Amino acid sequence: MVLTVAQDRALPSGPFESSHRSLQSGLRAWVERRTHHPLGYVEQLYTFADRDRTEAGARVISISYLGLTRQVRAAEGDARWQGWYRYFPWEDHRAGTPSVRSQMIAPRLAAWAKGAPTPAARRERRQRAAMVFGLDGQGWNEELVLQRYELLYEAGMVPEATRRADPLCLSPLPGEPMLHDHRRILATGIARLRAKIKYRPVVFELMPPSFTLLQLQQCVEALAGQRMHKQNFRRLIEQQELVEETGQIATETGGRPAKLVRFRRAIQQERAFAGTKLPVTRAT
């Protein structure tokens, strides 16, 4: 889920003001003021400064952040929670390969590659399409969210590219557009989070104080956009000693009662250090 504003077409943002002690404190203040929703874990993501980032054409520099929070209550004002696959339907492989990839993206990228001016350019386009979208026998890499979006933009297959007057833009792919380059920023954040969940327990920020292992697995699957083998997932959680039992049972599971677990205190302490300015690293 992603917290949006402007009728679901933008990410929360605002100008840096002299009263803000730091960029991060300014971010937290703006997001909470705009959405009435406090942030937990925050890290700087990327600086966007390309030309023509806005319809007005003004040169705007944006410093983006990845912020995590639990959806403990409904957003307020014009802020609303939206599933991020609404903006990137080709990224959700939990029910298998999405039809938009095979039925729309693959053939249109093939046509785009064929339209390149030279044999070398045609070959380079085909190779890029195969690599980032897992075509022609290539494997799917869930972390290449930004590369996929940027390739579709370059090929003129997303609404944000219509300013370039490319003929392919007349029939954009499914997936809600966003204002300016906010969908590119969102793609960058999803890619960062998909990579980070593999080596840091940031998923802690998204879970309630106690939960079942199935709920944890479903959260990870929603982030990665892929199904995970139940027993392999639980074995990995046990090997890494991420959680401990609470001694309580969840009965409202829609099936058999399940044990409630929580993240171990050591994991929570690592989370506390992650947001500081100290260069804290994992022990080797």
Roles of regions detected by a PLM:
Residues 1-11:
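N-terminal strand-loop-strand
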Residues 227-246:
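Charge-enriched amphipathic alpha-helical scaffolds
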Residues 67, 241-284:
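Long, intrinsically disordered, low-complexity Ser/Thr/Pro-rich regulatory/activation regions
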Residues 218-227:
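Short helix-coil junctions and helix-kink-helix linkers
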Residues 190-211:
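Positively charged, polyanion-binding regions of nucleic-acid-associated proteins
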Residues 28, 233-237, 252:
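Short, hydrophobic-biased segments on the C-terminal half of alpha helices
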Residues 10-21, 203-206:
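Short histidine-centered catalytic/ligand-binding loop motif
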Residues 20, 24-28, 32-161, 196-203, ...:
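Active-site segment of metal-dependent pyrophosphate-handling enzymes
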